[in-house]
């Protein structure tokens, strides 16, 4: 009997010893987007460390808004602020802009947009949509990464009048490939975005 109780005690103590090691460890932050052109990280206030290959990057903090370019990313120490931040790691895969044969103007520049920065890798725009004011029909000659800053809904309409409504929220990230034509209209709430065109 004593031997059985002793054996159970050993098993119980072993379980206590193993349990802490069995808890999930802090996993590496996974990218929100990863393709041949970019790796995009969404950071919260609680995590400022990412696994990066030390490429150039664009840093976007949502609040207070900061847009900055770094020739080499750091893999730690990002200040995500209270609302979070986005790091766009730029891979060594440049793609020349498409020749625009659509008959529509390029997506940028256009009214409502402010150029935040430009270099040989990116062109970054700060754009605000206005209720009741559709954008001109336009052509995207470059791949873009879009980071939305406000809650709202945008209706996107193609030249053949096909429409879709997208609900947007702060921190939402989208990668949109080039070779697209459409117009956009704010149909609900507000909408502002930092739009990074990839060269």
Enumerate the language-model features and the residues they cover.
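Ligand-binding loop in jelly-roll beta-barrel domains
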Residues: 55-57, 72-93, 151, 177-199
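Boundary at the C-terminal end of the N-terminal hydrophobic targeting segment
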Residues: 20-24
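Glycine- and acidic-residue-biased ligand/ion/polar-headgroup-sensing regions
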Residues: 49-67, 140-160
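Surface-exposed beta-loop interaction hotspot
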Residues: 79-124
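Bacterial N-terminal signal peptides
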Residues: 7-17
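Short acidic-glycine-tyrosine-enriched beta hairpin
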Residues: 61-74, 161-179
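N-terminal targeting signals for Sec/Tat export/insertion, comprising classic cleavable signal peptides
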Residues: 29-54
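Positively charged n-region of N-terminal signal peptides that target proteins for export
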Residues: 1-4
């Amino acid at each position: 009997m004593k031997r059985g109780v002793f054996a159970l005690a050993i098993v119980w103590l072993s379980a206590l010893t193993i349990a802490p090691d069995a808890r999930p460890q802090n996993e590496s932050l996974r990218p929100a987007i990863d393709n041949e052109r970019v790796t995009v990280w969404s950071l919260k206030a609680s995590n400022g460390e990412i696994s990066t290959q030390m490429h150039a990057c664009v840093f976007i903090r949502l609040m207070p808004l900061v847009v900055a370019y770094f020739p080499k990313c750091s893999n730690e120490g990002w200040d995500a602020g209270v609302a979070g931040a986005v790091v766009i790691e730029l891979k060594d895969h440049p793609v020349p802009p498409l020749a625009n044969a659509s008959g529509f103007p390029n997506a940028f520049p256009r009214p409502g947009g402010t150029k935040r920065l430009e270099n040989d890798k990116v062109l970054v725009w700060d754009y605000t949509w206005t209720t009741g004011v559709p954008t001109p029909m336009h052509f995207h000659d470059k791949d873009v990464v879009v980071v939305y800053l406000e809650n709202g809904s945008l209706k996107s309409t193609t030249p053949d009048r096909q429409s879709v409504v997208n609900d947007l929220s702060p921190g939402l990230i989208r990668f949109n490939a080039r070779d697209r034509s459409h117009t956009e209209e704010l149909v609900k709430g507000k909408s502002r975005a930092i739009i990074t065109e990839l060269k």
